[in-house]
Amino acid sequence: MKTQVLAVFVLCVLFCLAESRTTLNKRIDIAKRIECKCKGDAPDLSHMTGTVYFSCKGGDGSWSKCNTYTAVADCCHQA
């Protein structure tokens, strides 16, 4: 009986961990697609930077910051 209860508990914990991991991945994917409006560029919208162009630093330097979205994400547009 104790073994069965322990097995059910372990399965519940594993399920909760798997579900929270899936939810976190979905939030990260959604965050990368949030559009932000640049001041002076209305009605144009530019996407937040992802991991490649973090803080508006493109590989070729063609991105510039136009607005701060959060403490760790900037709204950028191609210059």
Swiss-Prot record:
Q: What is this protein called?
A: Delta-hormotoxin-Cpt1a
Keywords recorded for this protein, A-Z? Cleavage on pair of basic residues, Disulfide bond, Ion channel impairing toxin, Nematocyst, Neurotoxin, Secreted, Signal, Toxin, Voltage-gated sodium channel impairing toxin
Give the SUPFAM superfamilies listed for this entry. Defensin-like (SSF57392)
Q: What is its main location?
A: secreted
Protein localization: Secreted; Nematocyst
Which residues form each disulfide bond in the chain?
Answer: 36-75, 38-66, 56-76
Highest taxon of the source?
Eukaryota
The family annotation for this protein states: Belongs to the sea anemone sodium channel inhibitory toxin family.
Pfam families given in the database record = Toxin_4
Where does the signal peptide begin and end? Answer: 1-20
Residue positions assigned to the propeptide = 21-31
Q: Name one GO cellular component term.
A: extracellular region
